[in-house]
UniProtKB/Swiss-Prot annotation:
It comes from the Viruses. It is found in: Virion. Residues 1-5 form a propeptide. InterPro entries: Baseplate_phage_T4-like. This is Baseplate hub assembly protein gp26. GO terms for biological process: viral tail assembly. Baseplate hub assembly chaperone involved in the tail assembly. Keywords: Late protein, Viral release from host cell, Viral tail assembly, Virion. One of its GO terms (cellular component) is virion component.
Amino acid sequence: MYEYKFDVRVGSKIINCRAFTLKEYLELITAKNNGSVEVIVKKLIKDCTNAKDLNRQESELLLIHLWAHSLGEVNHENSWKCTCGTEIPTHINLLHTQIDAPEDLWYTLGDIKIKFRYPKIFDDKNIAHMIVSCIETIHANGESIPVEDLNEKELEDLYSIITESDIVAIKDMLLKPTVYLAVPIKCPECGKTHAHVIRGLKEFFELL
């Protein structure tokens, strides 16, 4: 059976991919409609690519490229409504999708600094677990300690000083980078120009 194969660049990584099949596409649509996309998306990335150790935003970008190549919808047709009421046909090149630039993930708690990593795709379904699993190292008193070297009591002491407001701030920091696509639009009626931005996997799925 013929397989359409292609490469996708995600940051510094070159990922080998194959287009997903009609059966896999229909499974994705069904999962989207019944709210169970996590299992299917992870399966598509596993079965259709050789990607390893991607974070959330990298996996989202890979999925969008996989979708665009597989369905032949590199140029997706959509419409945008101008403030003057005009419906404007809009051509969206999904391969122009980008991800926000990564940042150094440091968070300060009193005299302690915590180094985080970005979460994996769908880790954000449980925020508390996501935050705990993304801790890499603790910096205190001039020492840098990998989280796996902390004993149970030390971990409990660390978790006990993380307040509700800290949880919100850390969550926002970890989930800030996402996929986005800016589409320049000019209204043929009123002449107004606008950059329509599609942001986050949820908004991209609305194009399906």
